[in-house]
Design a protein with these regions (language model features):
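A short helix->beta-strand "capping" segment at the edge of beta-propeller domains
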Residues: 20-35
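Surface loop/turn motifs at the tips and blade-to-blade linkers of beta-strand repeat domains
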Residues: 30-34, 71-75, 113-120, 161-166, ...
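Conserved beta-strand positions in repeat-built beta-propeller and related beta-rich domains
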Residues: 34, 44, 51-56, 91-97, ...
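Beta-rich catalytic cores
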Residues: 37, 78, 124, 169, ...
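Short coil/turn segments that connect the beta-strands within blades of beta-propeller domains
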Residues: 46-48, 86-87, 133-135, 177-178, ...
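Short loop/turn segments that connect beta-strands within beta-propeller blades
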Residues: 63-67, 103-107, 152-155, 194-198, ...
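Conserved blade-ending motifs and adjacent loop-strand segments that build the rim/top face
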Residues: 202-215
């Protein structure tokens, strides 16, 4: 397995991060959801709703206002990340190190893949996305250390990036507008990264308690999901607020 640790990228990103004070941004809308302990959120293929996973291990499809549309029969184990593209929905389980691939039409599990990681059981994969720049899936480890693993189309690890002390933790990852975006629960921040080398290109401070999920809607608004508050927050795209 080819593995590249981009320490120079991490150092440069850290210098960029500390050189600029993060801009504070505020949500413009919010919607409550009945999904218990929600952990991550992704826009569905029709762009008329979201996929949400939670600590209870269930995959939900919700409307844009957070009301539950349907849910999968499958009961997973500590689902922390969700990504959707085309006919499939990809769910990352933290404790088991498994990625479940669901058929979006039937909500049945079409494939299960184990992606090994030797870290602590409760410090595993917190998010999953697809890096369109590098044409690879990416999963992110919460902390100790904060790592991004790039995966090929068969979910084999082909690259590992150590993000150093970018934040206290990372709770979600997504790809939007040719950038990788990371969310930190403990730091209450969102970061924009160069998708080619994962250097930090922007950071923003959020007034959200326990932010766990991150995506963008069809209009380009940034969507943040709060676990404790069971609330979906909508922000004007941070790139338009610079």
């Amino acid at each position: 397995m080819k593995k590249i640790i981009l320490y120079s990228a991490v150092l440069l990103g850290a210098l960029q991060l500390h050189a600029q004070k993060p801009q504070k941004i505020k949500p413009v809308k919010k919607f409550d959801t009945k999904v218990a302990e929600p952990s991550d959120i992704a826009l569905n293929a029709a762009k008329d709703g979201f996929w949400i996973v939670g600590d209870g291990g269930v995959l939900y499809e919700v409307n844009l206002d957070g009301t539950i549309r349907r849910q999968a029969d499958y009961q997973g184990l500590d689902c922390e990340g969700v990504y959707a593209e085309g006919k499939y929905v990809y769910v990352a389980e933290e404790l088991s190190r498994k990625i479940k691939v669901f058929d979006a039409a039937t909500l049945k599990v079409a494939r299960t893949v184990t992606v090994p990681y030797n870290g602590a059981r409760n410090k595993g994969y917190e998010g999953i996305a697809f890096n369109k720049t590098n044409d690879r899936f990416v999963v992110v480890v919460e902390k100790s250390p904060i790592n991004i693993f790039e995966l090929d189309k068969d979910f084999k690890i082909v690259n590992e990036i150590n993000l150093g002390n970018i934040a206290k933790d990372v709770s979600a990852i997504t790809y939007y507008n040719n950038s990788i975006w990371l969310l930190s629960d403990e730091s209450m921040m969102v970061f924009r990264l160069n998708p080619a080398d994962y250097t930090v290109t922007g950071s923003w401070k959020l007034p959200i308690l326990n932010p766990e999920g991150l995506t963008f809607d069809a209009e380009g608004n940034m969507i943040v999901l709060s676990d404790d508050m069971q609330t979906i927050y909508s922000f004007t795209n941070p790139e338009k607020q610079q």
